[in-house]
């Protein structure tokens, strides 16, 4: 069993359902501390955050990952227990295999080899791991970034191990992500008996025309890097459960995934304009999960492309799709951010898995990225 596969198996055995780490970070420390990496815990609340750094000089390269995983769901639906990793037909099965314990294993072994081959490398290397990515993300990377800023720590390059690949390892790299803006809207009406609508004010009926306008609005046309901004309603709640009561309040949860063509303020203003135009009595609160970011054709992107081509022969496609990642907290610092990891077809699903051969290939790609950036300086 290779070092990368061995570590991936050990990580998957830890039942680190968010926000638990379950000892995963200790496994990484055990492997990197002997190579000169200094470990520092930056924990907040129930979240464990680990900052491992080797060297103090610039430039600083950071591998970013998360040890927490989503719940496995019904255990009886799995072909093998989700936290008892099993290899079948060349695939490693287990919760977190692709998202993202396989990547963490590949990062770790890549760093081990790189430091052995280049003990006097220029710059510094670091690993940032959190146990709060799949959950609220309140006490994870966002808090660590604040600590690093207070120390004037500058991250030059950040490679996130999120599963970016689609059909083959390395066919897609993420060079950005859309922003995520959520809202909770409460339409206020007057409760009453369904037989006496003249004595009530139905918030569902009131909101229907506005909902139609919100869902058909063209928010922007996107650009060469991002698809058009999307608006989606995720939940609608109203009523008492009885069929003879007009509700007095309607609650709507919605989300925007937005491009660099729009600002948060512009979205908020347009939503409120639509609601006001329909004469609604409402309360509205917002939650910004992350701003859109984009890393153009910079050193990190070039180094990543070259490494993928050398190991797999592929020319990766740059993409900004998918959900949010912790890269959204690093990008505003000015760092170049790229996401590269295993195939994402099984993530968050029953029988999550990663190809065993992809683990070693990913580790080789990560090592080449380090060499492309640091070994030749």
UniProtKB/Swiss-Prot annotation:
Q: What is catalyzed by this enzyme? A: N-succinyl-(2S,6S)-2,6-diaminopimelate + H2O = (2S,6S)-2,6-diaminopimelate + succinate
Record InterPro entries: ArgE/DapE_CS (IPR001261), Bact_exopeptidase_dim_dom (IPR036264), DapE_proteobac (IPR005941), Peptidase_M20 (IPR002933), Peptidase_M20_dimer (IPR011650), Peptidase_M20A (IPR050072)
Q: Name one Pfam family in it.
A: Peptidase_M20
Q: Which PROSITE patterns match?
A: ARGE_DAPE_CPG2_2
Cystine links in this protein are: none
Residues of the active site: 68, 133 (proton acceptor)
Question: One GO molecular function term?
Answer: acetylornithine deacetylase activity
Cofactor field: Zn(2+); Co(2+)
UniProt keywords (A-Z) are:
Amino-acid biosynthesis, Cobalt, Diaminopimelate biosynthesis, Hydrolase, Lysine biosynthesis, Metal-binding, Zinc
Its BP terms in the Gene Ontology are: diaminopimelate biosynthetic process; L-arginine biosynthetic process; lysine biosynthetic process via diaminopimelate
The record lists Zn(2+) 1 as bound by 66, 99, 162
What is the cofactor note?
A: Binds 2 Zn(2+) or Co(2+) ions per subunit.
Which pathway does the database say it acts in?
Answer: Amino-acid biosynthesis; L-lysine biosynthesis via DAP pathway; LL-2,6-diaminopimelate from (S)-tetrahydrodipicolinate (succinylase route): step 3/3
E.C. number: 3.5.1.18
Residues annotated as binding Zn(2+) 2:
99, 134, 348
The record's function comment reads: Catalyzes the hydrolysis of N-succinyl-L,L-diaminopimelic acid (SDAP), forming succinate and LL-2,6-diaminopimelate (DAP), an intermediate involved in the bacterial biosynthesis of lysine and meso-diaminopimelic acid, an essential component of bacterial cell walls.
Recorded family membership:
Belongs to the peptidase M20A family. DapE subfamily.
Subunit annotation: Homodimer.
Question: What name is this protein filed under?
Answer: Succinyl-diaminopimelate desuccinylase
